[in-house]
Design a protein with these regions (language model features):
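Aliphatic-rich helix starts adjacent to a transmembrane/signal segment
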Residues: 14-31
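Short, surface-exposed interaction loops/tails
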Residues: 76-136
Length: 136
């Protein structure tokens, strides 16, 4: 019985880590798909969608069961820089729109340096980087 308990104490954390990596990979894939759908919308209508509902993705949830976050800077108006996600130097990650998942903790803050943002799955550099905010 002690051997089974020991094996379980080793296997469960490994399994949980694998599940979390799979959720992150799924969020990254979803963001790539959304990015492609946003680009097709922009080509067709010569503007970015105001929200994800315009590309029929308003109810899409991330792997942690939270909605994906999207902000079109054109729709946000002149104060968009205050709402944009920012890197370690407080420079906006993108110049047209932000798209991200709030990650496992379901919380986020504008600068990536905020503790709540570390597990966010972000799109930065106009899609040149999609991954964990903590890795950017």
């Amino acid at each position: 019985m002690a051997i089974i308990a020991t094996l379980a104490s080793i296997a469960v954390p490994i399994y949980m880590g694998l599940m979390e990596r799979a959720r992150i990979a799924k969020a990254m894939a979803d963001i790539r798909i959304l990015e492609s759908e946003i680009a097709m919308f922009e080509l067709d209508r010569t503007r970015l969608p105001v929200n994800l509902g315009e590309i029929n993705r308003a109810v899409l949830k991330d792997p942690w069961d939270n909605p994906y976050e999207y902000l079109s800077f054109a729709a946000a108006g002149p104060g968009w820089k205050g709402k944009a996600r920012k890197d370690h130097f407080l420079v906006p990650l993108n110049s047209t729109y932000d798209l991200y998942s709030k990650g496992k903790n379901g919380k986020s803050a504008s600068p990536l340096t905020a503790q709540a943002s570390g597990d966010d799955v972000i799109r930065a550099n106009h899609g040149g980087y999609i991954g964990l905010a903590s890795g950017y």
